[in-house]
Regions:
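Long, compositionally biased intrinsically disordered regulatory segments in eukaryotic proteins
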Residues: 1-97
Length: 97
């Protein structure tokens, strides 16, 4: 798939099962960016990671990785390594009680 074809709408079609609890028509690429980034990274595998890199800037990705509490620890660690984010700056996941 060429870069020009990798649009937000194409991502929603390809990754629709990941957004089972959300109305895709209500998702906004920028306003809901951190939510979309975390969902793609947590459940989208390598395809989700590639979509994140294609759709979002480095700063948007770093912000989501630092601030989203729902990222899996392995995803958070991988992204911290990829984007050289100091682990001390990452928000810790809150365990279920």
């Amino acid at each position: 798939m060429q870069t020009s074809e990798r649009t937000f709408q194409n991502m929603l079609k390809e990754m629709k099962p990941l957004f089972w609890d959300t109305d895709p028509d209500q998702l906004d690429q920028r306003r809901n960016g951190p939510y979309i980034i975390s969902r793609l990274l947590n459940m989208g595998g390598m395809a989700g990671y590639c979509w994140v890199k294609d759709l979002y800037t480095k700063d948007e990705i770093i912000w989501a990785v630092i601030h989203r509490r729902d990222l899996k620890p392995v995803v958070r660690s991988f992204m911290a390594q990829q984007y050289h984010i100091p682990k001390e700056t990452l928000v810790r996941q809150i365990p279920w009680r």
